[in-house]
UniProtKB/Swiss-Prot annotation:
Predicted to be exported by the Tat system. The position of the signal peptide cleavage has not been experimentally proven. The gene is glcI. This is Glucan endo-1,3-beta-glucosidase. PROSITE patterns: GH64, RICIN_B_LECTIN, TAT. Residues 1-36 form the signal peptide. It is an enzyme of class 3 (hydrolase). It comes from Arthrobacter sp. (strain YCWD3). GO terms for biological process: cell wall organization. Pfam families: Glyco_hydro_64, Ricin_B_lectin. SUPFAM superfamilies: Ricin B-like lectins. Residues 422-548 form the Ricin B-type lectin domain. Keywords: Cell wall biogenesis/degradation, Glycosidase, Hydrolase, Lectin, Periplasm, Signal.
Length: 548
């Protein structure tokens, strides 16, 4: 947690900065009691890709020691006694599921990756007394260059399981990840829209970024490199992002950027202004606390080098936020960062097209398309502090995927039905409820999350007609919209489809049948007081789990 600071003289200064959302945690969390999480949990891998054979690898670090885990979850350190010349690593592969099949292994407490390859085993090497040489397929000489593979990142420790689907290094074979909670429900992420895998490549090539695409000797697509790698090997031009960065630097010579990196500390803010080639940030006392040289394209796409983010509570959070604003090309349009509204992301013609398309093709809009995509909680990550099981589902390359559901099956849990009649709070998370701001029944007042209080603004009557009412008004999808991100507000009851809702007791989703989408906390986890509510593609995440 950031160090406490005396805020009495800083509050007036901080009020000049608009309130914005914060960075979320990535793959590190606050530890719960050690007894909460066992030494291993089951990991079920389901192969819906139609391809095989599949080879699995569980690789990572424990207590600073690198190694691999077998199917039973036993950790094996890599051999020592290795010098600076890489040597082949022991075969750590685990036989994966055949097409249409599943296998379950044990996932141990590690911080690392689960790799999976299609058709042939991968090649790993070790160096310098047991350090793993990870695949680096941006180099044509890498032994894994012509192998189709992908991986998920995970951390399992006493604080729970963090697992994500990642595109930080490349876009390749589609997959989902999930975690089962103690109540039996499964949170999942990573599912693509129908035909989203090929749609990504088509759009990337049409935008002139086809140099990132790597093909197998037979001409089939293997992956698209993340521009953080592509820029370093000359696969894309730096001209566009260089132009954008120059304009940003010039813009902030005469105005300030306000960075509010922590939602739980809205008073912790930093103001930055450009001086020469340096973007200099000050705290509330006017003291300079961080400075960043005008970054080159590699620094922006990789969020490193000139934008290096140390693991501290000042420079690192500022660097993360600044890099996210540059990658998403929101720095010019919004001086208050991080930007809370994803609708404004990637709108500049000079934007990171790779990241834009990765988010566009995700069913829930969330991706890990660059290193700090968790700024503002836009990353494809699920977490639970008491995980019962984990899931990876290898999805089809064409057509429509099905979401991970209870037990890791491909069937949706529960059957969406009617709306149970009754009156009471609509709870989400442990302490929050659906709320009419200021108990104001004016039409178009967008609903929000607020700490549960039991007042009239949080008492919702669920009718047999499918309506949800509070303060004499109906819960309504703004202007009968169907797009992700459409606001949900209260409005005079009118009997239209914009005011009809169903409830799935298994997934705890409140669904608007007219749009086919679910009631969603804007921006996802971490859930927080004041968070607006919207319509979004149903995804079984924490942001859509409502308790009647």
């Amino acid at each position: 947690m950031p160090h406490d600071r005396k805020n009495s003289s800083r509050r007036a200064w901080a009020a000049l900065c608009a309130a914005v959302l914060a960075v979320s945690g990535a793959l590190v969390g606050v530890a719960a009691p050690a007894s909460a999480v066992p030494a291993t949990i089951p990991l079920t891998i389901t192969n819906d890709s139609g391809r095989g054979p599949i080879y699995l690898y569980v690789l990572g670090e424990r207590d600073g020691v690198a190694g691999w885990a077998d199917a039973g979850g036993t950790f094996h350190p890599w051999p020592g006694g290795v010098g600076p010349v890489p040597v082949p690593a022991p075969d750590a592969s685990i036989a994966g599921p055949g097409p249409g099949q599943s296998v379950t292994i044990r996932l141990p407490k590690l911080s690392g990756r689960v790799y999976y390859s299609y058709g042939q085993k991968m090649t790993f090497q070790i160096v310098l007394d047991g350090r793993l040489v990870q695949p680096a397929v941006q180099n044509d000489s890498d032994p894994n260059r012509n192998i189709l593979f992908n991986w998920t990142e995970y951390t399992l420790n006493d604080g729970g399981l963090w697992i994500n689907s990642t595109q930080v290094d490349h876009w390749s074979a589609p997959y989902q990840v999930g975690v089962q909670r103690a109540d039996g429900q499964v949170l999942s992420t990573g599912m693509l829209k129908p035909n989203g895998y090929e749609a990504f490549y088509t759009a990337l090539e049409s935008a002139g970024w086809g140099g990132l695409v790597q093909r197998a000797p037979d001409g089939s697509r293997l992956r698209a490199l993340n521009p953080s790698h592509g820029i370093d090997v000359g696969k894309i031009s730096s001209a566009s992002i260089d132009s954008y960065v120059t304009e940003v630097w010039n813009s902030y010579r005469t105005r300030d950027m306000c960075v509010t990196p922590f939602s739980h500390e809205p008073g912790t803010q930093f103001r930055g202004r450009v001086d020469g080639d340096w973007f200099r940030f000050r705290n509330g006392s006017g003291q300079e606390v961080a400075a960043f040289k005008k970054p080159d394209a590699s620094s922006v796409y990789g969020c490193h080098k000139d934008l290096q983010a140390p693991n501290d509570h000042v420079v690192g959070p500022i660097a993360r936020t600044l890099c996210a604003a540059l990658v998403r090309t929101t720095a010019l349009t919004n001086p208050n960062q991080p930007d809370a509204n994803s609708a404004g992301f990637y709108q500049d013609a000079r934007t990171n097209v790779y990241a834009k398309l990765a988010h566009q093709q995700m069913a829930n809009g969330k991706a890990y398309a660059f290193a700090f995509d968790d700024v503002g909680a836009h990353e494809s990550l699920v977490h639970d502090g008491n995980p019962q099981a984990a899931y990876i589902k290898l999805d089809p390359f064409t057509g429509t995927a099905t979401p991970i559901a209870n037990g890791g099956s491909t069937e949706q849990p529960g059957t969406p039905g009617g709306l149970p009649a009754g009156t009471g709070a609509l709870r989400i998370g442990s302490t929050l409820c659906l709320d009419v701001p200021w108990a104001d029944p004016t039409d178009t007042n967008q609903v929000q999350l607020a700490t549960c209080s039991g007042n009239a603004a949080q008492q919702w009557t669920r009718g047999t007609d499918g309506t949800v009412r509070a303060l004499g008004k109906c819960l309504d999808v703004a202007r009968s919209g169907t797009a992700d991100g459409t606001a949900v507000w209260i409005y005079t009851c009118n009997g239209t489809g914009a005011q009809k809702w169903t409830y799935d007791s298994a997934t705890k989703a409140l669904r608007n049948p007219q749009s086919g989408k679910c009631l969603d906390a804007q921006g996802g986890a971490p859930l927080r007081d004041g968070q607006k509510v919207q319509l979004w593609t149903c995804n079984q995440t924490e942001a859509q789990r409502w308790t009647l």
